[in-house]
Amino acid sequence: MTFPNINPIIFSIGPLAISWYSLSYVIGILLGWFYANKIVEKFKPQITKKNLEDFITYAVIGIIVGGRLGFVLLYNPSRYFSNPIDILKTYEGGMSFHGGALGGIIAAYLFCRKYKINFLSLTDIIAPVVPIGLFLGRIANFINGELYGRITNSSFGMIFPNSDLMPRHPSQLYEAFFEGLVLFSILAYTTFKHKTLKKCGLNSGIFFTFYGLFRITIEIFREPDIQIGFILDSLTMGQILSVPMLLLGSYLICQSNPK
C-alpha cells in the first residue's frame, strides 16, 4: 500500500502553523461536547448542560497537560529533561493517551468535588464521547507518519517516510478503527439501547475494559517507541499501562451489577 503523503501542516501564517494534529484536538472537543449534550438531552441524568459547559475548561486543561506530561515522563524523559522548552512544542506531536486519561480523570474529580456532583455520573457521560477524540487523534498520527506498526509482508504493509523504508502495519488506522469507531459504536449501543446510564459506573467500566483490550491487542502490531523498546522482553509500555485500565473497567462493571 502507498502512504498518502499529506502535509502535517494545514496552513501557516508567519510563525503560526495550524497542524492536523492540533485540529484533531479542537474538532474532537467540539464534537464530544455536542454528543455529550445530546446524551444529556435524551436521558436527563444528574448532569446538566450547564455542568458540561463548565466542565469543558477542566477537561481541556486536564487532557492536554496530562497527555503531554505523560508522554514526557513515560516515553522520552531524557530528551525533554535536557531540552525543557521542547515540552511546549505540542504541535510536533507527542501526547500520551494514558496520561491524557489520567489528567482528564483528575480534572473530573476536581470538578465534581467543587460542584458536588457524583464522579461516576460525569464519567459515564464522558465515556461514550472519548472514542471520537481517539479516532481523530489516530488519524492525525497517521497523517504525521508517526506511531507506525511493525514490519510486515502482508498486503496491509505501508512504507512510511520517516521510517526505515520497510513495509509496516498502519497501526494508527487499526487503532482509529477499534479504539475509535468500534468503541464508539459499542458505547452508543449500550447507552441508547440498554440504558446503561441507569447503572452508575457501567459506561465507564465498558470504556476502560474495551479500550484496554483493544490497545493491548493492537500493540502487537505497533512498533514500540524506539527510545523505550520492549519492557520485560516482549511487552510494550502501551500494554503495561493498559492493564490497569482493563482491571479498573472490569471492577466498575462488576460493581454496577451487584448480585
UniProtKB/Swiss-Prot annotation:
The chain crosses the membrane at residues 9-29, 55-75, 92-112, 117-137, 172-192, 201-221, 228-248. InterPro entries: Lgt. Pathway: Protein modification; lipoprotein biosynthesis (diacylglyceryl transfer). PROSITE patterns: LGT. The keyword Transferase applies. It is found in: Cell inner membrane. It is a multi-pass membrane protein. Keywords: Cell inner membrane, Cell membrane, Membrane, Transferase, Transmembrane, Transmembrane helix. One of its GO terms (molecular function) is phosphatidylglycerol-prolipoprotein diacylglyceryl transferase activity. GO terms for cellular component: plasma membrane. This is Phosphatidylglycerol--prolipoprotein diacylglyceryl transferase. The lineage of its organism: Bacteria, Pseudomonadati, Pseudomonadota, Alphaproteobacteria, Rickettsiales. The gene is lgt.
